[in-house]
Amino acid sequence: MIVGLGTDIVEIARIADKVPAAGDEAALAKCPLAKRVLTQAEMAIFVASSQPGRYLAKRFAAKEAAAKALGTGIGRGVSFQHIEISNDANGAPLIAFQGGAAERLSLLGGSRAHLSIADEKHYATATVILESN
């Protein structure tokens, strides 16, 4: 049974304008928006990315969609740091919850999360579906 559904869309340029140029690893590692949104594991990928603005926009959209699926949004016991986005060996996106996000998922009776991320020239979008057993 579906216990949560969230979607988000982000204008990539809005995020990319706040991100230093690719290749400037020192500046990227200090990027305030990235430090707020990304976990340590995500930050390592961001710093090495050839398109850091696009990478951050996609992660931002995914985490906002997840927070909406949890029914809280960001800031009501759930932070960006409580949600981690990674990829499996085939490149499919995976989502993991810690802290307040994991607590909220448990409260909803959720046991599985499905994530889809898409991007085009100007926009990144994500949808999260939470399921119970």
UniProtKB/Swiss-Prot annotation:
Protein name: Holo-[acyl-carrier-protein] synthase
Source organism phylogeny: Bacteria, Pseudomonadati, Pseudomonadota, Gammaproteobacteria, Alteromonadales
E.C. designation(s): 2.7.8.7
Record flagged with keyword Disulfide bond: no
Any one biological process term the GO annotation gives: fatty acid biosynthetic process
Residues that coordinate or bind Mg(2+): 8, 64
Cofactor(s) in the UniProt record: Mg(2+)
A GO term, aspect molecular function: holo-[acyl-carrier-protein] synthase activity
Location(s) in or outside the cell: Cytoplasm
Broad EC category: transferase
GO cellular component terms, A-Z: cytoplasm
Assigned protein family: Belongs to the P-Pant transferase superfamily. AcpS family.
Gene label: acpS
